[in-house]
A protein has these predicted regions:
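Short, ordered beta-strand-loop transition motifs
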Residues: 56-61, 71-72, 91-95, 124-130, ...
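Long, charged/polar, surface-exposed segments that mediate recognition or autoinhibition
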Residues: 76-130
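A charged, solvent-exposed segment within the mature domains of Sec-exported extracytoplasmic proteins
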Residues: 110-157
Length: 157
């Protein structure tokens, strides 16, 4: 019985690890945020298989966009999802914000586990809404996890 339980736990851990392996790590997202440069974003993300898709503009400003296992329409709406975990990384043109959007709930939970392992306080802020988790750590950037709507249901900011 113990062997069966051990086998099941091993399978769960390996599936969770696989679910996260093709998404940018939290440490890399923080590195991009701290350097605040397009060059660092390109170096880190393109080495991991992300493809640069250009600059999108909305009411909040301009963002540089990279995608993995998916494509974007000319309006930067996600389309053509491929095998594996689809994700999109946006770097605000001013370098003040990095967004990581994922489609898979397991990959989203994996990002949260990485933040927890880095020693962040995983508490909710007093004014946070349902589906928003604000994580803090001294002398480190604040990380926010948000549950949104399709086509990009999960976001780490």
């Amino acid at each position: 019985m113990k062997k069966i339980l051990l086998l099941i736990m091993t399978l769960i851990v390996s599936m969770t690890t696989f679910a996260q392996s093709d998404i940018v790590s939290v440490a890399d997202a923080i590195k991009i945020f701290q350097t605040k440069t397009l060059y660092t974003g390109q170096q880190v993300l393109e080495k991991q298989g992300y493809i640069y898709k250009g600059i999108s503009t909305d009411s909040y400003g301009k963002d540089h966009n990279w995608v993995k296992n998916m494509n974007l329409t000319k309006d930067f709406v996600p389309t053509a999802f491929a095998k594996g975990n689809s994700s999109m990384v946006q770097l605000d043109n001013t370098g003040k914000t990095v967004y990581v959007y994922v489609i898979n709930r397991t990959a989203f939970a994996g990002l949260q586990a990485q933040v927890r392992a880095m020693g962040y306080d995983m508490g909710k802020a007093a004014k946070s809404s349902k589906g928003t988790l604000i994580c803090t750590k001294d002398n480190q950037p604040t990380i926010t996890f948000m549950t949104l709507q399709m086509p990009l249901p999960f976001c780490m900011q």
